[in-house]
């Protein structure tokens, strides 16, 4: 019996697998490597994170993105050089071969629990028991369309439903939202000769500022750079995640929204 079952083989699932292996904890990992990145993310997508903040986990046994790029002849910079979706997906597949070569493609279809163990059922028909389960299935299963728009689904889609935007050429498209997905979708629509209009409940759009090494010293001191954004709040959250975890839920949600 494996001590841990990891569900999902994207960046987080692979990072967990690497750490479990480092600690000599027995595990089984299920999923298809980087599936969402390969099949559900839009063509032309660029990561919001900088190169130095796009490594899969922090375990020393996991090669960094910089190492992957150097080995395979791809350009790389800690900051200022956008990372393409396809490059990151290839990096993930390369990492999987090293930290989780025993990845199983079976899908978990049911989880139950008794007093001591979790019971896992796979689509292959196999059933197994484990002490711990890590769910690392990503966010695509949580795509949200407001109920006020549900009756117009014939002409409304969620951004996660599109790999390409070729069919929108020459058409006016309203994009609702002001985050990563919304602004990225608007940019990709524009690149395909569509006419996007962004609707958001904010007076201004806040997007990536210039990387830290391009800012003047006073700005870097007042708002230091971290892997999750600029500012002391983001830096402390990154360096002391256990302290952040103990903050009240409302405070954590507020910080996450503002970072």
Regions found by a protein language model. Give the residues of each.
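Flavin (primarily FAD) cofactor-binding/catalytic cores of flavoenzymes
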Residues: 1-34, 77-259
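Dinucleotide-binding Rossmann-like beta1-alpha1 core, especially the glycine-rich loop
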Residues: 35, 40-56, 69-95
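N-terminal glycine-rich dinucleotide-binding loop that anchors FAD/FMN and/or NAD(P) in oxidoreductases
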Residues: 41-70, 214-239
